[in-house]
Amino acid sequence: MKQGIHPEYHQVIFLDTTTNFKFLSGSTKTSSEMMEWEDGKEYPVIRLDISSDSHPFYTGRQKFAAADGRVERFNKKFGLKSNN
């Protein structure tokens, strides 16, 4: 590895602002805001709008829309009947 070209990698706390869910992970991102973690050490805090704790896909609150294909929409729009 070349010296001096890689960003500094350190532990940070990611905070989901929607649910106040926190997790500690390694990152090159940093922040001036600090927070104490469960181990008693202080780490920089990165605020997230959405994480796996609040995203509908991971929480099971996802809504599935009936997605018609382009051909079905065309036939429905112009009144054509399918051959099936």
UniProtKB/Swiss-Prot annotation:
PROSITE patterns: RIBOSOMAL_L31. GO terms for molecular function: structural constituent of ribosome. Part of the 50S ribosomal subunit. GO terms for cellular component: ribonucleoprotein complex; ribosome. Keywords: Ribonucleoprotein, Ribosomal protein. Pfam families: Ribosomal_L31. InterPro entries: Ribosomal_bL28/bL31-like_sf (IPR034704), Ribosomal_bL31 (IPR002150), Ribosomal_bL31_B (IPR027493), Ribosomal_bL31_sf (IPR042105). One of its GO terms (biological process) is translation. The keyword Cell membrane does not apply. SUPFAM superfamilies: L28p-like. The gene is rpmE2. This is Large ribosomal subunit protein bL31B. The keyword Ribosomal protein applies. Belongs to the bacterial ribosomal protein bL31 family. Type B subfamily.
